Amino acid sequence: MQINSSWQERFLADPPREKDHRPPFRRDRGRILHSAAFRCLQAKTQIHAIGENDFYRTRLTHSLEVAQIGSSIVAQMKLIDSFIYLAQQLKEDRADLQKQLKLILPSNDLIESLCFAHDIGHPPFGHGGEVALNYMMRHHGGFEGNAQTFRLLTKLEPYTPNAGMNLTRRTLLGVVKYPTILDRSSPQYHQGVIVDNVDSKYVKISAWKPGKGIFRDDLKMFEWLLEPLSENDRTLFGQYKKERTRPDEVLKTRYKSLDCSIMELADDIAYAVHDLEDAIVVGVVTFQQWQSAVEKLAECRSEWIVQTISSLSQKLFSELHYERKNAIGALVNYFITHVRWKINNGFSEPLLRYNAELPDEVIEVLNIFKRFVWEYVIKHVDTQRVEYKGQRMLTEMFQIFDSDPLRLLPRNTAMRWQKATETDRKRIICDYIAGMSDAYALRVYQQL
């Protein structure tokens, strides 16, 4: 099984460089790794409740760990055991499937590129920053972190004049988690009238949490990305999981590419396990709180989890650091070694027809971990207060820049603003703020 050569194409032809024999995805990896946006992740906090502690993870270390897990998932998907379920579904020999499908797996360079890039569009102060920018862009296409990642890769990062990092199609396809336009999936734009009678200082996260998709501003590059797909594949790729039944319902697309499915599993595993580790180490969660998850895990369908969760829990909260690391390693290994192949029958394009997945009983375990982190870490009052403070800061900062941009924006940003249309001017201010780290946003706010 071969991959269409169009997936290795770039929007702009790369200038030739003497003796540069790197394959396309290694070039992509290098561009992401050396970008300013990637470096900025070192100053964006993964969990805001953690506070000042040398142990905690940043968005940068999180991305490195996601890359490591992603590479391990690719290795798992080369093993014959990962084809058992697919072979049963298709009534084919798993050795034959292994021989065919190994050829379409991403290289380590490619999967690391996706994992390095997956968070680079996320704004300062997490969900609070995202809500602030979505509210301030409510009349101009909205804001969402994954959409900003695509925009940064295809337009903003100054590797080319107008094509961002000028990455290969396949790399960009792997980064797109939600192949739709944001203003179609985001509920605020489907209530008839956008509510404006709210003091921007008191915008509720529940009212302005964005949907998922690509900015309409970046539609041209999105359409170029999907050119190799048949009309049927393109239509199916953008299909939602269900139709909107309430005005405030966020819509999500149903399908992802093979590479994206691997990256997203790696991200979920890192979030569920490593963020839990951070929270345990610095005391954000207690052994008593963890028992609520243990009770659910003890009743799940995974035999290994049922048998080991008691001893794993003791190790997770042990004062002996090596015991906790062993427990974390065992959990990560459990998730990785259960990844298997999945088929989406409606597609003809191999990169969409096949995905990575976890069995239902393992997803059940992963979701218990994710819900615990969400409930006791992300929704922790300290996290929410920091994110709310950041939300107010970014909202006010946007208003300040919008009031006198030529005076207050950096020179290059101000020049771009001056040449832009009214809608594009708002997006330029949004791009500038979204690219800030937590610490830099705080410094700029204090200067203003």
Swiss-Prot record:
Gene3D superfamilies assigned to the protein according to its UniProt record, in alphabetical order: Hypothetical protein af1432
Keyword Hydrolase assigned: yes
Claim: Hydrolase is one of the keywords in the record: yes
The HD domain, residue ranges: 59-272
UniProt-listed SMART domains: HDc (SM00471)
Alphabetic keyword roster: Hydrolase
Domain of life, per lineage: Bacteria
Residue ranges with Basic and acidic residues bias: 11-26
Alphabetical list of Pfam families matching this protein: HD (PF01966), HD_assoc (PF13286)
Residue ranges of coiled coil: none
GO biological process: dGTP catabolic process
Molecular functions (GO terms): dGTPase activity
InterPro entries: dGTPase, dGTPase-like, dNTPase_2, HD/PDEase_dom, HD_domain, PHydrolase_assoc_dom
Annotated protein name in UniProt: Deoxyguanosinetriphosphate triphosphohydrolase-like protein
